[in-house]
Structures are given as C-alpha cells and as structure tokens.
C-alpha cells in the first residue's frame, strides 16, 4: 500500500493520519498523531469464522509503552507487564462504540490493537486510539458499518471544551467521552460533578458536531486508500426447520418468559429448550445448534413483543416500575462501615475501610503519576448467578464496573483537609439480576454514611433500557438481566439530587438520537430520586462518630526544616516513635503531618513526642532527659526524641564525682540544663546546674557530717 498522509483541524489542533507507512501486513493500520500524542492502531481478522460459538469474537488491546513518556519500567524485569487498570478501561472505551457496528452473525475473530507510542498530556491517547481504531477498521477489508468519531468534552468556566488540555481537565466540571456515527450516538461515558441532565445532553449534542467532522474526514480517507470489504458468509438456518421450531416452541417460550422470578424463569426456559431438542433430535440430529439459535430468536422476539404490545415486562412490571428495594447498614460488626443494598434479585454488600493517608494508591502509567485517596473495588463471584467457575483475579468487567461506581462517588468524597483518611470501598455482588454496578453505587453511599464519612451528598444509580422497533421507542426503567441481554441499550446513570455524577451508555443498535437520550435521562432522574428516598429511610446522614474500630487521625503542621529531625538518622527517630506508640506517621513536604493511631491516646502521645522534637532546644532551658549511654568522661542524655547531649562528669553533681556510675545509670530520668549548643549543633548539658537549691544545701550538710 502506498504511504499517504491525511490531515484535519480538530478543536484547534492538527489530527494527522498516516496509512501505508507501517504494519502493512495487518488488514488495516493507522498511524495517528494529535498534538504530540502518537498511537498506532491495527485491525486484523481471521479468514474463517470460528465454529461453535454464538457471539462475535472481538478483542481490543490497549498497549501502554513507558517509552512514550521517556520512562524505563520499574522492578527487576524492566519491561511492561500485564495491562494497567487504566489500559483495561481504555480498551473497553475503544471496544464499546465499534462492537455494535459489525454485521450481525459475523463470527470471524477480530483483533484491534492500539499501541501508544508517544504521549502529550494535552492530547489524551485513548481518544486518539478510538479515532485510530475507526480508521484502521474502515480502510480494511473487515466488514464494519462505520466509520465512527470520538471526542472528549469538558465543562470549563461554563463553556464546553472539545478534547480539553491537561490544565482544562483539572478545572473541568465533567469529563465526557462521546462516540458516534454521522447520524447517531453509539457510546457515552461520563464523570461529572453533579452536572444537570440538560447540560449533559447539550454536551453530547455539541460533541456530535465534531464527531460528524471526524467521520467525514475518515470517509475521505476510505475513498482514497480503503479496500473492498470481504464478503461475509453468514450461516443460514434451514427455513423449514425454523418454521417447525417456531410452530412448536413459540407459545411454550412465551409462557416460560412470563415467570416473575429469575431462577424459576431460567429453569422453565431450560426445560423448554430440552423439550424442543428432544422433540427434533431424530428429525434434525445435525442441526441442534441451529435449533438453539432459533429458540434465542423466539425468546428475544417474544420478550420485546410483550413489552411493545402489552406494555408489561417478564417480571410483571410496567415500563417505569422499579423493583422492590430494601437496604440495611451496619451489617458487619468489626468493619468501619457496611451496607447491603437489594433491588429485586440484585443484591450487593459494600464495605468501607478507612486507612492512613499513606495508604493511598500510587498509579504509574503513561499519564502523570496519580494518587488515589479513594478507591472502589467490585467483585462478581460465580455464586451470584448460581454458576460454578474457577475463582481468578478481577476481569475486565469487574474492573470496568468498579471504576464506574468509583467515578459516581468521587465528586462527593470529602477533601483530604476535611477528612484525612484513605477510603477503600469493596462491593461484593451477592446476587445478580441486572445493574449490579448501580447497586454498588447505592451500597457505597450507604456504607460511607455508616462509616461516618462526611460525604457532600448521597448518590444513587439506575440502569435504563431501550426497546426500539422501527419508529416506536420504549424506555425501560431499572432493567434486569434478560432486558439488558435482549434489549437495545444499557444506559447507566448515577447522581445526587442535584445532578449527574457518572454515565455509561452502551447500545446494540447502530445509534440513538437526542430525543431518546433526553427521554432516558429524564426517566433516570425520576427513578434516581425515588431510590435516594428509599436509601435515606435507612440512614438519613453520615454518622457523627466513626466506628470504634476505625483508626483516629491527629493532624499537625510542623516547620518543613524540622522534618529531617522527626525522621532522624537512617529513620531511627520516627521508627522509635512508631514502635513506642503503635501509630503510623505520614509527612508531606510542606510540613503537614498525619498521625494515624489505633486510639486517640496513642495519637496524642505520638504528637507530644513530635512536638518535643520540633521544639527548639534553648540554652538555659531545663529538660527531663533519659540516660542513654555512659562513658568514663560523662553521660549521654536524650532530652527529646532524636536529640541528645553530653553531661560531663564534672557537671553531674556539685560535689566531686569519681565514677559516673556513682551518680547515674543507663535508663535513669534526670533533670538537665542546656549550657551550650556549639557550631556543630552538639548540645552540652549540666546536671548540677539543674539541681534545686535544696539539693545543693543537702549536699553541703552531707559533706560537713563527713568532715
């Protein structure tokens, strides 16, 4: 392929796409540059469809290379390891807008790899990778109903900003990523600081103007260098077989679908499947997979027909009805905060743990080093859906759901100054029937309030669905698993009473317009307020007191020049304070100091020890010190942690001393006076000058008796 370069202006910066330059053996490859960010995106597909599967085998990889920011990986191996959490989330961001645009029934393996080669903090590499994936697929022979365009939108000083710079992102009230085709929106992801729904909607519409420009730009590239699409050979089911299965199974599936309870419904559907397979096994012994596919079609059609014609869902709810909700807080006696949130057959246990400031998570990647004071982890065990499978580490889904719930609560987490703790939330899915991520949002709010974290406002989440048949559009509130599986949209919205804090929208159709988005957002707000009301019936506000098992934090501000004194030589001083009090100490460069203690008494003791260190030693001051060592010429006495001086043998007493041990021994607490601090900072002490007059008089009387 001939090397070609294409350029366009996007939000005040040049977007440059080069094709035919590198990776020429891939089906499609694009070298994309935006600002100083460079991403290589490749797309490859297998020549033959994968046999025996009923899904589209698409994989997306987002490869972070630390050389892109001029760094060498840490650790012993010195090379990149498994993908970071950020890389996994970026891969999901690329995957979601392109997945619905492949032909239905396409079963060839497709792999999209985005390799980040150079990073400009002002040009987010994930946005560049999303554009690059659309280019690579569109110019290739892989069947793809694109192209798509993608942009980020910020809200800075009341104005929308496309692809905001690093500085603008820091100031922005929201971070919105929107993908779409020329005609419709296909994916939305957002984190926001209680932004009204109308503003979110306006931002999506504003983004679509730029998406259209990107799509037009990519269409121009396709005209110049695109190759003809490969012919898709889709598996066709024998018409006679399909007619017979439909005639035999449709009513049975309809009746099984009308079962309100998920497990019973699934059992009934399984029975129908087994009955149908048994009925046709002799007539069509080699077409059992085709029969399964027909049964899936019937189930999808019947569920959607029920909603469209009867306005009733499989569990008997109306389109706007929310499943029964119950909540409980303080369910675990020894944790810092805990809650169970149940909505229908979806149930999540969320546990809050408070830690020291030093427990923050340090994230190293191709962006700036990040420090996370608040984190949310999501676990989805197999028992939550009644299955048996090996327990492994968190997968992409768990990481994605955890990040969504984390983003939803982030705007209401108190600042470090208000609440000097690291906060970790863990959501354990106990039972799943749709929208576990939004149940995690609700459970997180309850657990934080139970822990006494002074959140700015409670947050709730709800998942909306869509059934779109020709011109008829039906929005479903609080979708369950089967409605997500067989419906056209999964639109998760989380927020406070005031506004939206997080959005995630995925669709299975080519796109949706503003009217559908507006309808979904309005219904989501109404549902969210209802859920919030139910939650606040259980706990109205954060508890006034922390759990007795939670650590206590004592805050101090010290002179930054005294930090090295607190730490001491080779860390001896701070280690001694920690070992004697059982606390954890975190010191910032500006002098802010946090003592995290198991109880207030230990915290106050550590504080007093630190105050003694940071207090300047004054000549003429009298201190109670501890004898650390004895030498023939005197005693070394510690008058403050890490600060010791010498009491010469001649200054131990007002009478003549022959041996130091005759007056003091190691471990004695004695009063001493600072008589001198030399140029090297060495402290000269005197015991005799610290003696009260009475002791001096007693010494004289004793001396007279001896005479």
UniProtKB/Swiss-Prot annotation:
> A Gene Ontology CC term for this entry?
cytosol
Please give the Gene3D superfamilies that the UniProt record associates with this protein: GHMP Kinase, N-terminal domain, K Homology domain, type 1, Nucleic acid-binding proteins
Q: What GO molecular-function term can you cite, just one?
A: magnesium ion binding
Record's subcellular location = Cytoplasm
InterPro entries named among the record's database cross-references: ExoRNase_PH_dom1 (IPR001247), ExoRNase_PH_dom2 (IPR015847), ExoRNase_PH_dom2_sf (IPR036345), KH_dom (IPR004087), KH_dom_type_1 (IPR004088), KH_dom_type_1_sf (IPR036612), NA-bd_OB-fold (IPR012340), PNPase (IPR012162)
Compositional bias of kind Basic and acidic residues:
698-707
Span list, region Disordered? 688-707
Pfam families given in the database record: KH_1 (PF00013), PNPase (PF03726), RNase_PH (PF01138), RNase_PH_C (PF03725), S1 (PF00575)
Could you give a single Gene Ontology term from the biological process aspect? mRNA catabolic process
Q: What reaction does this catalyse?
A: RNA(n+1) + phosphate = RNA(n) + a ribonucleoside 5'-diphosphate
Q: Does the keyword Metal-binding apply?
A: yes
The entry's Mg(2+)-binding residues are 484, 490
State the EC number(s): 2.7.7.8
User: Domain named KH: which ranges?
Assistant: 551-610
**Which superkingdom?**
Bacteria
Supply the enzyme class, top level. Answer: transferase
UniProt keyword list: Cytoplasm, Magnesium, Metal-binding, Nucleotidyltransferase, RNA-binding, Transferase
> Which co-factor is required?
Mg(2+)
Q: Which family is this protein grouped under?
A: Belongs to the polyribonucleotide nucleotidyltransferase family.
Q: Which PANTHER family does this entry report, sorted A to Z? A: POLYRIBONUCLEOTIDE NUCLEOTIDYLTRANSFERASE (PTHR11252), POLYRIBONUCLEOTIDE NUCLEOTIDYLTRANSFERASE 1, MITOCHONDRIAL (PTHR11252:SF0)
Q: Sum up the protein's function in the record's words.
A: Involved in mRNA degradation. Catalyzes the phosphorolysis of single-stranded polyribonucleotides processively in the 3'- to 5'-direction.
Among HAMAP family, the record links this protein to: PNPase
This protein's name = Polyribonucleotide nucleotidyltransferase
């Amino acid at each position: 392929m001939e090397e070609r370069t294409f350029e366009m202006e996007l939000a005040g910066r040049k977007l440059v796409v080069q094709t035919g330059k590198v990776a020429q053996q891939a089906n499609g490859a694009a070298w994309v540059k935006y600002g100083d960010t460079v991403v290589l995106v490749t797309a490859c597909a297998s020549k033959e469809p994968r046999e025996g599967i009923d899904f589209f085998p698409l994989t997306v990889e987002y490869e972070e290379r630390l050389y892109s920011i001029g760094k060498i990986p840490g650790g012993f191996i010195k090379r990149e390891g498994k993908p970071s959490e950020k890389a996994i989330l970026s891969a999901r961001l690329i995957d979601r807008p392109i997945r619905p645009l492949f032909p239905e029934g396409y079963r060839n393996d497709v792999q999209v790899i985005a390799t980040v080669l150079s990073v400009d903090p002002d040009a987010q590499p994930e946005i560049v990778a999303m554009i690059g994936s659309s280019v690579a697929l569109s110019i290739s022979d892989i069947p793809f109903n694109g192209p798509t365009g993608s942009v980020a939108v910020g809200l800075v000083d009341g104005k929308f900003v496309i692809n905001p710079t690093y500085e603008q992102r820091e100031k922005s009230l929201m971070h919105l990523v929107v993908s779409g085709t020329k005609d419709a929106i296909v994916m939305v992801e957002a984190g926001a600081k209680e932004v009204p729904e109308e503003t979110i909607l306006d931002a999506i519409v504003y983004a679509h103007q730029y998406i259209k420009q990107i799509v037009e730009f990519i269409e121009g590239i396709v005209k110049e260098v695109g190759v003809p699409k490969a012919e898709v050979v889709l598996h066709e089911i024998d018409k006679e077989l399909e007619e017979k299965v439909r005639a035999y199974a449709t009513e049975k599936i309809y009746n099984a679908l009308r079962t309100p309870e998920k497990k019973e419904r699934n059992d009934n559907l399984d029975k129908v499947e087994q009955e149908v397979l048994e009925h046709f096994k002799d007539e069509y012994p080699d077409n059992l997979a085709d029969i399964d596919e027909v049964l899936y079609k019937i189930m999808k059609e019947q569920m959607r027909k029920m909603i469209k014609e009867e306005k009733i869902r499989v569990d008997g709810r109306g389109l706007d009805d929310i499943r029964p909700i119950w909540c409980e807080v303080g369910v675990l006696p020894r944790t810092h905060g805990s809650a169970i949130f149940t909505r229908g057959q979806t149930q999540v246990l969320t546990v809050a743990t408070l830690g020291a400031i030093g427990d923050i998570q340090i994230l190293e990647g191709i962006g700036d080093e990040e420090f996370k004071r608040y984190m949310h982890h999501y676990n989805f065990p197999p028992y939550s859906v009644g299955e048996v499978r090996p327990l492994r580490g968190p997968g992409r889904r768990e990481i994605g759901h955890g990040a969504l719930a984390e983003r939803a609560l982030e705007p209401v987490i108190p600042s470090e100054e208000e609440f000097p703790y690291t906060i970790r939330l863990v959501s354990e899915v106990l039972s799943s029937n749709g929208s576990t991520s939004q149940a995690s949002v609700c459970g997180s709010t309850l657990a934080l309030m139970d822990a006494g974290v002074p959140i700015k406002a409670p947050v709730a989440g709800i998942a909306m669905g869509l059934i779109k048949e020709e011109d008829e559009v039906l929005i479903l509130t609080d979708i369950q698993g089967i409605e997500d599986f067989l419906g056209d949209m999964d639109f998760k919205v989380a927020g406070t009473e005031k506004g939206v804090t997080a959005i995630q929208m995925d669709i299975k159709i080519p796109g949706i317009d503003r009217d559908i988005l507006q309808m979904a957002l309005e219904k989501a707000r109404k549902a969210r307020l209802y859920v919030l009301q139910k939650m606040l019936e259980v706990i109205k506000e954060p508890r006034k007191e922390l759990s007795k098992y939670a650590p206590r934090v004592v805050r101090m501000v010290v002179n930054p020049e005294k930090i090295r004194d607190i730490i001491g030589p080779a860390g001896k001083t701070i280690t001694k304070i920690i070992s004697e009090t059982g606390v954890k100490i975190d010191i910032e460069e500006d002098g802010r100091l946090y003592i995290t203690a198991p109880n207030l008494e230990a915290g106050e003791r550590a504080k007093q020890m630190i105050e003694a260190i940071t207090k300047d030693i004054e000549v003429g001051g009298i201190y109670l010190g501890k004898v650390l060592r004895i030498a023939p010429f005197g005693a070394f006495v510690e008058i403050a942690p890490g600060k010791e001086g010498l009491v010469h043998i001649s200054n131990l007493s007002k009478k003549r001393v022959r041996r130091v041990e005759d007056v003091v021994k190691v471990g004695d607490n004695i009063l001493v006076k600072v008589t001198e601090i030399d140029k090297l900072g060495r402290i000269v002490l005197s015991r005799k000058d610290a003696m009260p007059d009475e002791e001096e008089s007693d010494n004289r009387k004793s001396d007279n008796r001896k005479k």
